[in-house]
Amino acid sequence: MRLSECLFRSILFCVSVLTASVSLRAAGTTQVFFSPEGGCTDAIVHEVRSASRSVHVQAFSFTSLPIARALSEASKRGVEVAVIFDQGIVQEPHAAMDILVAAGVPWFLDREHSIAHNKVMVIDDSVVVTGSFNFTTAAEHHNAENVLVIRDVDLATRYQANWKLHRAHSQPGTLPGTLAAPTRSSRRVRRP
């Protein structure tokens, strides 16, 4: 075998290993919702309100007050709620974030990636909510989006493992009033 052919096969093997997908046998049930005005937010709120143990969220964008309220209520009734946001969240309006902070929901910023574009909830280790739908008002009322609610323990286990992977490299968030980068004057050191 020539060196170039050997090198090609080695590269092909590495690429196939790195891009391997996981095949899961279909089990459980799936519901689909579309927007605008197709019930995506209501479906998500329903699932969060049905949670009894945990709701782990990965969100690129987050301005939906109904979803924020549902997460807050879940936390207050003892459900473990934690949210990983894309670092760009700090530039969005903070009304939904304020609801989470007031409820004591821990949240984290994923700065490991250029964009943390996930839109996922893993609920009670058995339900996955995912799709193109950002957890925003615009996604419900203006955008063409979709949400899948998948009840499948094996799939939820895979998503939960991915959530934990991202949580491991994410940094704890700070209160909304301190999200902005330090100003030049706030970085000055006072000298005695």
Please name every model-derived segment.
Residues R9-S21:
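Bacterial N-terminal signal peptides
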Residues I123, V127-P192:
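Signature of lipid phosphatidyltransferase scaffolds
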Residues A95-N143:
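Surface-exposed, polar helix/loop patches in the mature regions of secreted/periplasmic/lumenal proteins
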Residues L24-G28:
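Boundary at the C-terminal end of the N-terminal hydrophobic targeting segment
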Residues Q31-F34, H56-Q58, A82-F85, F108-L109, ...:
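Structural recognition of the beta-strand scaffold that forms the well-ordered cores
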Residues S61-L65, Q87-Q91, H113-A116, V127-V128, ...:
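Solvent-exposed loop/turn segments at secondary-structure junctions
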Residues H46-P106:
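Primarily the HKD phosphodiesterase
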Residues M1-C6:
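N-terminal secretory signal peptides that target proteins for export/translocation
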